[in-house]
Amino acid sequence: MGSPHREAIRTARSVVVKVGTTALTTPSGVFDAGRLAELADAIESRMKAGTDVVIVSSGAIAAGIEPLGLSRRPKDLATKQAAASVGQVALVNSWSAAFARYGRTVGQVLLTAHDIAMRVQHTNAQRTLDRLRALHAVGIVNENDTVATNEIRFGDNDRLSALVAHLVGADALVLLSDIDGLYDADPRKFQNARFIPEVSGPADLDGVVAGQGSHLGTGGMASKMSSALLAADAGVPVLLAPAADAAAALTDASVGTVFAARSERMSARRFWVRYAAESAGSLTLDEGAVRAVVGHRRSLLPAGITAVAGKFFGGDVVDLCGPDATMVARGVVAYDATELAAMMGRSTSELPGELRRPAVHADDLVAV
């Protein structure tokens, strides 16, 4: 009997496909439009079978290296951004040409972490991608490297693809790269590295040693593991597979490592609070408040707060930390920082009527 988690990938009606930089370049780091076209062929086959697909494509910086006459991937931020601005044109043109062979139109969607973190931009991005799919266009998503900073140096779109998967309500996420799947150690360095075909939860990753990014991109195994677990925790199954076997990955999911999704999909709002929103500050809780919030999923009352940090306002997302400063939850706060600083440690009966709401309502809390 086959794996039910691979079956979930096979039968998904909506899929986000993340294509890493190394999947689009030669071993020497040159952008290869031929490789991209081959991936488009595999993706087209899945779409022809009736699946909606959104592509998260890396490769803009790599695609800009040759046109700018650079000998290697730049290291300084300004040159990376210049290469990205040139390469993004070549990248999208290549995707456009590849899908034009099948009569399909592509749409470019450039995002930053800030766009995902801010609720209004988050919703607008969701609407744009949903509308592209409704119009039978292929959404090509990439990080907006020309204005991003840390985003260029970390992740190589792995985390972005997990966020987009939940953003569009995808049934599955497929990460295509230059690796066969997940091993308990780097197989290029350790001959006895053990292949892990299926991950049912974080406990399966105990003892796994994950490497960092390649010289062509920035997303190493650690980034892919983290992003796969993020998506799986939100209810989206993930397949980590080699781009060379994209056809098999997208047809029968018979290759790579599959990450099982949690049984209950996280709501869009709770996902945004937990993973996407930027934290505007933090609240330190006493032990009783931690038990109430984490153990019993109750609202946070001002009486359980011992410290307030940051300049936030009602409606912002804040971190909730225990007495040892470890984050235990995140939530949407109901009051400004200045108000909470005056309210903390006081029982509800001591507060004026307009200040008797919970500091963070249980419906706006997500344990971490």
UniProtKB/Swiss-Prot annotation:
Gene3D superfamilies cross-referenced by the UniProt entry: Acetylglutamate kinase-like, PUA domain
EC number: 2.7.2.11
One GO biological process term: L-proline biosynthetic process
Top EC class of this enzyme: transferase
Residues annotated to bind ATP: 18, 177-178, 218-224
GO (cellular component) term, any one: cytosol
One Gene Ontology term of the molecular function aspect: RNA binding
Domain of life: Bacteria
UniProt keyword list: Amino-acid biosynthesis, ATP-binding, Cytoplasm, Kinase, Nucleotide-binding, Proline biosynthesis, Transferase
Major location category of this protein: cytoplasm
Catalysed reactions, semicolon-separated: L-glutamate + ATP = L-glutamyl 5-phosphate + ADP
Locations listed in the record: Cytoplasm
Presence of keyword ATP-binding: yes
Binding, substrate: 58, 145, 157
UniProt pathway annotation: Amino-acid biosynthesis; L-proline biosynthesis; L-glutamate 5-semialdehyde from L-glutamate: step 1/2
Record domain PUA: where: 280-358
Protein family according to the UniProt entry: Belongs to the glutamate 5-kinase family.
Function: Catalyzes the transfer of a phosphate group to glutamate to form L-glutamate 5-phosphate.
PANTHER family noted in UniProt: GLUTAMATE 5-KINASE (PTHR43654), ISOPENTENYL PHOSPHATE KINASE (PTHR43654:SF1)
Name recorded for this polypeptide: Glutamate 5-kinase
Species the sequence originates in: Mycobacterium ulcerans (strain Agy99)
Lineage, top ranks: Bacteria, Bacillati, Actinomycetota, Actinomycetes, Mycobacteriales
